[in-house]
């Protein structure tokens, strides 16, 4: 019997377009023999539109941009009515706010359906980089020195540099794909970067610059997660790995696996698994960390990592254990069902 898969994508975040590309990769690599594949597009205005029973290849992102005249509530209700609750798994591919902050996960839990990826708590904790760093600090996870600022805080630029380093990165706490990130070495640059980051979020993070390769490690699993071999994006002619370098720069190269000392690689993989469990994650995530002088610093966790042709997550499993993209997605769907059944087994009454 075919499973009904509903790929949920789009959303109101700054990573809307990336989500559409991830959804296309997903839809095209899900076996149409195993699955009845459906797509649910969430417009920027939060209207839901469903494309049912997809059997042909989606050749462009434009095919997945859908519209409706219904209101938000009407469109959501219409989609819920169309979802077959039997033998069904929801596959969220919404990046950034709304998709990675626990919002959509809570919505699906209300529907009492299995879904791929992290739970509400893990998603919410990892979405805010400031809170993530606070938890890392309490648990002695190695990371860059940092300062969190809120919109109406008083701050001293000189003190921020003293608490971090002579060069820093400023980023919104609740954005991904390097949206709103700027580097600063002077007080003038820092003030400009702070004001820029506050355009995207009311909480921002100022972090010490660590110069060294940024490892990306895919992690998959529920109670017993497994980390992939590390990969690195090699970038050219840009200061850091920004949005354009991630998705638009043809010169950006993937090094998978990243050549490094065998013991250090094993340490990095174990560290990725450790923070995955620490943050109460399930399904899948990507853990990013810097390596310098044989030391590791965890940077961030992406609970809905990119699944585009330029994304690291599926490629890392190919170089780790020769899994195809389709096999990765099959595994994630299986993990979703496993987690759902486990949670349903817990008592809700005394």
UniProtKB/Swiss-Prot annotation:
The set of disulfide-linked cysteines is none
Question: Which EC number(s) does UniProt give?
Answer: 6.3.2.4
Subcellular location(s): the record lists: Cytoplasm
According to the UniProt entry, its GO molecular function terms are: ATP binding; D-alanine-D-alanine ligase activity; metal ion binding
Q: Residue limits of the ATP-grasp domain?
A: 133-334
Cofactor(s) in the UniProt record: Mg(2+); Mn(2+)
Which GO biological-process labels does this protein carry?
cell wall organization; peptidoglycan biosynthetic process; regulation of cell shape
**Which EC main class describes this enzyme?**
ligase
Instruction: Detail which positions bind Mg(2+) 1.
Output: 288, 300
Q: Which UniProt keywords apply?
A: ATP-binding, Cell shape, Cell wall biogenesis/degradation, Cytoplasm, Ligase, Magnesium, Manganese, Metal-binding, Nucleotide-binding, Peptidoglycan synthesis
| GO CC annotation terms, alphabetical | cytosol
Q: In which pathway does it act?
A: Cell wall biogenesis; peptidoglycan biosynthesis
Tell me the Pfam families matching this sequence: Dala_Dala_lig_C (PF07478), Dala_Dala_lig_N (PF01820)
Q: Any idea which positions bind Mg(2+) 2?
A: 300, 302
Task: Specify which residues bind ATP according to the UniProt entry for this protein.
Answer: 161-216
| Catalytic activity entry | 2 D-alanine + ATP = D-alanyl-D-alanine + ADP + phosphate + H(+)
Q: How is the cofactor bound?
A: Binds 2 magnesium or manganese ions per subunit.
Question: InterPro entries from the xrefs?
Answer: ATP-grasp (IPR011761), ATP_grasp_subdomain_1 (IPR013815), D-Ala_lig_Van_CS (IPR000291), D_ala_D_ala (IPR005905), Dala_Dala_lig_C (IPR011095), Dala_Dala_lig_N (IPR011127), PreATP-grasp_dom_sf (IPR016185)
Domain of life per record: Bacteria
**Family (UniProt):** Belongs to the D-alanine--D-alanine ligase family.
Q: Which NCBIfam families match?
A: D_ala_D_alaTIGR, PRK01966.1-4
Role description: Cell wall formation.
Q: Which HAMAP family match?
A: Dala_Dala_lig
Protein name in the entry: D-alanine--D-alanine ligase
Q: Which species is listed as the source?
A: Finegoldia magna (strain ATCC 29328 / DSM 20472 / WAL 2508) (Peptostreptococcus magnus)
């Amino acid at each position: 019997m075919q499973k009904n898969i509903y790929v949920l994508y789009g959303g109101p975040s700054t990573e809307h377009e990336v989500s559409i590309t991830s959804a296309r990769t997903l839809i095209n690599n899900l076996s149409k023999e195993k699955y009845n594949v459906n797509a649910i597009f969430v417009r920027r205005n939060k209207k839901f539109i469903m494309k049912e029973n997809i059997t042909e290849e989606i050749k462009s992102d434009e095919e997945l941009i859908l519209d409706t005249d219904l209101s938000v509530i009407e469109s959501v209700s219409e989609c819920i009515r169309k979802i077959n609750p039997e033998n069904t798994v929801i596959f969220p591919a919404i990046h950034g706010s709304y998709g990675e902050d626990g919002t959509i996960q809570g919505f699906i839990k209300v529907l009492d359906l299995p879904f791929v990826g992290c739970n509400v708590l893990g998603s919410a904790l990892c979405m805010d980089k400031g809170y993530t760093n606070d938890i890392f600090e309490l648990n002695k996870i190695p990371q860059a020195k940092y300062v969190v600022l809120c919109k109406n805080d008083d701050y001293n630029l000189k003190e921020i540099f003293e608490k971090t380093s002579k060069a820093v990165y400023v980023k919104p706490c609740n954005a991904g794909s390097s949206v709103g990130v700027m580097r600063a070495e002077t007080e003038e640059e820092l003030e400009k970067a702070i004001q820029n980051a506050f355009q995207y979020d009311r909480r921002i993070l100022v972090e010490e610059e660590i110069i060294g390769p940024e490892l990306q490690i895919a992690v998959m699993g529920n109670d017993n997660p497994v980390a992939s071999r590390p990969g690195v994006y090699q970038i050219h002619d840009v200061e850091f790995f920004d949005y354009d370098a991630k998705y638009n720069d043809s010169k950006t190269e993937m090094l998978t696996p990243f050549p490094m000392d065998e013991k250090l690689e094993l340490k990095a993989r174990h560290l990725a698994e450790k923070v995955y469990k620490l943050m109460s994650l399930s399904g899948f995530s990507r853990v990013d960390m810097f390596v310098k002088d044989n030391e590791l610093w965890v940077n961030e966790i992406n609970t809905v990592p990119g699944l585009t042709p330029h994304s690291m997550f599926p490629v890392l499993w190919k170089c780790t254990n020769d899994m195809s993209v389709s096999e990765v997605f099959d595994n994630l769907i299986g993990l979703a069902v496993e987690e759902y059944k486990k949670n349903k087994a817990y008592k809700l009454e005394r």
